[in-house]
Amino acid sequence: MLSAIVGVNWGDEGKGRIVDYLSQDFDIVSRYQGGNNAGHTVVNEKGTFILNLLPSGILRDGTVNVMGAGMVIDIEHLVGEIGRLREKGIEISPENLKISDRATICMPYHRIQDCLEEDRLSDKKFGSTRRGIAPVYADKYMKKTIRMGDLRDIDGIADHLRDIVEWKNLLIEGGYHHEPIDAEKMLTWLRTYGKPLLPYICNTSEYLSKAADEGKKILFEAQLGALRDIDYGIYPYTSSSNSIAAFSTIGAGIPQLHLDESIGVMKAYSTCVGEGPFVCELFGEEGEILRRAGNEYGAATGRPRRVGGFDVVASRYGARVQGATAIALTKLDILSYFDKIPVCVAYEIDGKRVDTFPTGSALNNAKPVYEYFDGWKEDISDCRSFDELPEAAKKYIDFIETRIGVQIKYISVGAERDSIITR
């Protein structure tokens, strides 16, 4: 069984807690793209955990976690993340964590370049997390990066790194007028943070292929959402990798295999971190009330998330490009006690009603067409079956399910690990 858990919207949908919940039924959890530019928040009996690089299955005993070839890894951040989890009693060893030798290393100069470019763009910025993600993916396709497997022989790639740094300084020093990168310091950085990771680095493609042949259950964990995918998202306000489910087996390291199911995750309302069009955004007091109720601040950056009503148009599109066979709806409990709940059912562009998700500048001109639903004035966090939910909540879910066209199989009604309804 090969399953993917992917974001339907702009990211921050709650994928981490769904992975944590479902990973009990899987042998392996694999991240397949992205870096430490997003955070997956998981709450369990040991506390609250924010994972930037490690797969969310690391919090489950007996689950093997794989960091795939499609990832870009800041090794300094990873060493720190492993250390912080160990301090909270989480066991991490080569038995439950395996890192692809083909994964790309995000270097300190990638972070520097990211910050310099975002500052240069000023009010035209893309909303980067400043973690170096776009520069490292760009360098990957320029074939000017270091990979995790290279950490086994840093002396052997020293001249290659020096050549890369010389090339990189043409931009850093010549273009941005910043102090040049010191290649020897970069080599020291690789040795310092690479050494503790060596036991985890292996041929994960071979490992996953063998596991699949043996009938092991593998769960692929996406970072960000469909609308941040480099090809199918709201370009250029996207990430720099493919976050869609179709890329999961490729990025993980088993491109010869295909998914059996794709579980799309979306919130019961809309949130967005970063720049770009966000049609159903709520402003002022209305938006602030929802933001505070949902504690909507980026797990990786701490930035306040933009919030809005549920967007049927964007979510239907996201579910389609993700090939979603089922939906997990998160944070339904946050909408408790609202008098009226807005749902964006269509867009209006240049005076015309539009039901399909547009691309390019048309999205900038879109206005939301709302329908309003009655709220429910009660706590639903103890509900563990669909029938226990208030009628207004059930009506809200049924409407969304009908409009999206995919079954809502999982519904989260609280932050705790078991606060999920399975239909």
Regions picked out by a protein language model, each given a short descriptive name:
Residues 1-423:
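Non-transmembrane, aqueous-exposed alpha-helical and coiled segments at domain scale
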